[in-house]
Amino acid sequence: MFLEKDYLKLKIKQFLPEFLSIYTPSGEEYKAKDFFEKIASELDLSLQVTSTNSYLLGDGDILLVGHVDTVPGFINPKEEGEIIYGRGAVDDKGPLISMIIAASILNKNGYSVTVGALSDEENKSKGAREILRIGKKYDYIIVGEPTNTFGVVVEYRGVIHLDILCRARSEHSSSATSNLIFEIAKKIINTTRINTGYDDVSIVPTIFKSGEYLNVTPSNAVVHFDIRYSVRNSKDQIMSEIHREFEGCEIHEVEDISPVKVDVNSDIVKVFMRSIIKENYKPTILRKRGTSDMNILKDLALKGILAYGPGNSSLEHTDHEKISLDEIFIATKVYINAIEALWPKM
């Protein structure tokens, strides 16, 4: 009964609109506590609320992990037929509901799994870092991000966030012999790399601050760079080039998350590909240009990690987030089939 389409769709319609009605931007995941207590009780899953306001449902050696937080900007949930709209429908509440329903069915069938509904993924990944600090290892970790329902993500790029502070002597603008803004602008132009290929380093300035007075050249300037790089790039080389260009400036590394890449011939990837085929769809291998909790959690996976989930990834972070019952139904079946196939390999 549990795998019948009507039953699964009924559960999705029961849980997802309510979840979407709870506005949980990063830092406000605590608002979902009552919801998780309710869903855990109804689906007979144990529940642990952590210090970062993440929620752990069930207890097993396979971890299904998604995130509770969304980007800012509430969207009133609505339903049109079998389409559900709302902030987080795609990223990441739709995939998370799919995982929780799959986990409840798997646990009833004797396959013990844990669902991690983590906090702060859209910010500094406090939830994932907390799981990393706890240190429990899992045989397999599946990260529930929207992968267009038929995609399997085997690679995410890493990220480096840099704040660079440069100083100079300020002068009256009418008789200035130099200008820090002009000098730093040249360095920014020399450093920036946009519209690059996947395996090329992307270096994008996102914040620039300088100057205090209308008639005085600035004494300091701050630029923030968002740097993305793949496993084929060297962080040391990237940083060496930055230090050379901004010699004499203070360079502060705000965040560094290393890239992650999974062997396409690994058991977990092949099993998920077969599970999608089993549902009569053609799977695709994906490489994501951004970064996710998969980068942070990779060292906790003893045998394999990947990302898979329902939802059109092009709708992430937009005001048009929507997901269909069919997408979540298919993903739920894929999660169940894949974990049942992985179980003998543990």
From Swiss-Prot:
It is found in: Cytoplasm. InterPro entries: ArgE/DapE_CS, Bact_exopeptidase_dim_dom, LysK, Peptidase_M20, Peptidase_M20_dimer, Peptidase_M20A. The active site is at D69, E121. It comes from Sulfolobus acidocaldarius (strain ATCC 33909 / DSM 639 / JCM 8929 / NBRC 15157 / NCIMB 11770). It is an enzyme of class 3 (hydrolase). One of its GO terms (molecular function) is cobalt ion binding. Zn(2+) 2 binds at D91, E122, H317. It comes from the Archaea. Belongs to the peptidase M20A family. LysK subfamily. The gene is lysK. Pathway: Amino-acid biosynthesis; L-lysine biosynthesis via AAA pathway; L-lysine from L-alpha-aminoadipate (Thermus route): step 5/5; Amino-acid biosynthesis; L-arginine biosynthesis. This is [LysW]-lysine/[LysW]-ornithine hydrolase. PROSITE patterns: ARGE_DAPE_CPG2_1, ARGE_DAPE_CPG2_2. GO terms for cellular component: cytoplasm. Pfam families: M20_dimer, Peptidase_M20. It catalyses: [amino-group carrier protein]-C-terminal-gamma-(L-lysyl)-L-glutamate + H2O = [amino-group carrier protein]-C-terminal-L-glutamate + L-lysine; [amino-group carrier protein]-C-terminal-gamma-(L-ornithyl)-L-glutamate + H2O = [amino-group carrier protein]-C-terminal-L-glutamate + L-ornithine. NCBIfam families: dapE-lys-deAc (TIGR01902), PRK00466.1 (NF001747). Its EC number is 3.5.1.130, 3.5.1.132. Zn(2+) 1 binds at H67, D91, E145. Its cofactor is Zn(2+); Co(2+).
